[in-house]
Amino acid sequence: MQEYIVQAGDTLSNIARRFLGANGDWREIARINNITNPVSLQIGQRLLIPNPATPPIAQNPEVAMVRNTLQGVHPPNKIAISFTTVGSDLIANLLNTGQQERFAKTKDLGLYRFGIFKLRDFIIYGSGLLQQLQMSPSEINVMLVTSANEGSLDAINTWDNQYLSFGIFQWTLGSAGQAGELPALLSNLKRRYPTEFQYYFGQFGVDTISMDGVTGWLSLNGKQLVNAADKNIMRQPIWALRFAIAGMDALVQSVQVLHAVSRLDQFYFRPSQTLQGFALSQLLTSEFAVALLLDHHVNRPSHVIGCVADAIARSGLTAAQIAQGSGDNEALIIQNYLILRETYGGANAMTKSRERAESIRNAIATGNLSPQRFSFRSNRQVRV
């Protein structure tokens, strides 16, 4: 056991990286020192630091802890890391330590990693960070059930036409010639935790540019990634490994959660002429409804408002009647909405709409989501 005196600018994450390796678990330091809030460190505070341990190599990528031993290599690159495949398993060979990690599976043009860090676990070990984010219980409930339909905090996909997708909502780099949502997530990380951004991305030449708050572009060594040739670079296994490792950091995870719930600002609280001048937040107000709408927006963002408008028309009610009405009216709209969204958009309809809806509905039976009207409560007004 070692002892360390907290210095200005220290976080549990960077202390863990310094003493336990770059994938060191800050939660172990917190446990040993009885720290319940990971952002409550004080300059001069004495911490006990456990001795680093080398974990066994796991055999399945979906349960493999990618252990970042690249701390002494700045920047880590293909000289320090090589990649091999065994069947469909992608293995990172860390040449400075001899360690091998099965961290993903190959598919088509790239790879995928299911990840091991679940939002439900972060809700427990990251509770102090969630308090800092000022997340409401309703927002946490909605995030838990919708993230189950998407991915883990360290999930990666590089095989489809979006080039690189990351995290609980699988934010994408964007197709060739198009902006993507992943740069907006990284921009949020850069603004809130610049040291973490620099460690995981900036030191490798990554930056964000031309942001509009929702989408933007990545640049690599000063060059904006725009066309297919530019973005194809991000299919390289080294980038998947870097993003997977970043997705294991509690501060990066907290930004994912905040960025995910902030998606509601894009569509749920905004009045729409398609909805007769009302906002969805005035019409569908249960946690169940918000979870369904958010899940739809992640999958098919341009479909949500129109599909709800069609559900209202099908019900024979006006938006004003729904806004002033009872839970029965909301239940009717949801019923019609779920029927319509299975085919809304034709060939481009929501992926697995029925299965995703049932997954969310199951949370009602377990008491993790409320179907009651006005049960959804947002803290968006008090967040900075």
Predicted feature locations:
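Cell-wall polysaccharide-cleaving catalytic domain and substrate-binding groove, primarily
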Residues: 13, 26, 33, 56-246, ...
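Residues at alpha-helix boundaries and the short loops/turns that link adjacent helices
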Residues: 23, 35-38
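Intrinsically disordered, low-complexity Ser/Thr-rich linker and spacer segments
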Residues: 1-3, 50-61
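Primarily a LysM-type cell-wall glycan-binding module
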Residues: 1-23, 45
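Disulfide-stabilized cysteine-rich extracellular repeat microdomains
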Residues: 9-11, 34-35, 46, 52
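Residue-level detector of conserved, well-ordered beta-strand and adjacent loop positions
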Residues: 7, 30, 50, 172
